Amino acid sequence: MIQRREYLGQLADWKDESVIKVVTGIRRCGKSTLLNQYQEYLRNDGVADEQIISINFEDLDFEELLNYKELHRYIKERLCEGKMTYIFLDEIQKVDSFQKVVDSLYIKENVDLYITGSNAYMLSGDLATLLSGRYVEISMLPLSYHEYCEAAGRESCAELFSDFMKYGGFPYIATTNKTEEKVDMYLEGIYNTVIINDIEERQRRKENDPDKRKVTDITLLKSISKYLASVIGSPVSVKSVTDYLVSSGRKVSQNTVSDYIDALTDSFVFYTADRFDIAGIQLL
């Protein structure tokens, strides 16, 4: 298992600080593994097992804790009086009204809180307002090329670099005996999970906001995703994407395209690279 030293260092730097540590990143980039590694770091630093509460909301064993009141009760019963308790809530966005739990735990003494999520939308709206000035976001990416080589147990070479550029840095890909078919199936699984599950989760969070347009056309979403993937590295705008779709026979507005692109970036399928005016040293 490769040590994600950069992110472990960031968590360690914020240890025992009175801010909530929020780890975000695309599915399968290694967030859960990072939390496990950090918990081991805490144990090696003298933290007792009873001072660590760790819950992964994708684990069926914790299904009853998807109710925020049950979750709050469960954690309260396990807090260590007079000692720091380290709380890890993995994929917290699956819990309805999780903001209430996070806010309640934050105001308690001797609580060091860490949460993860696979959708940036969890940090907008109510949670952002609730936690304003009280959290730090650690944005996690898949493996860097250096980490990829380390995970693969090989020195850098043309073949390894070619694989990295073609398939990306998801940890599983670096460590498995891969064939092109296996990797394609694995990546397709991640993509479909993000498109369907994570964006559906984003929609559920927006249901109470009538001013927000909903992502309802998965075919359109995939079309936009494929187009964006085909023009990576080139200047792109909402208008250029809309023009492409219209020329392909899709009737769609720029507002709709903008909303769908937001959904893709919120789920970390794409990242924006802002354009700079070099002459004026100015962000456009």
Please provide the spans of the model-predicted regions.
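Hydrophobic anchor at the beta1->P-loop junction of P-loop NTPases
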Residues: 23
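Structural recognition of the conserved hydrophobic beta-strand(s) that form the central parallel beta-sheet
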Residues: 88, 112-118, 139
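Short regulatory helix/loop adjacent to the ATP-binding pocket of P-loop NTPases
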Residues: 104, 121-137, 151-153
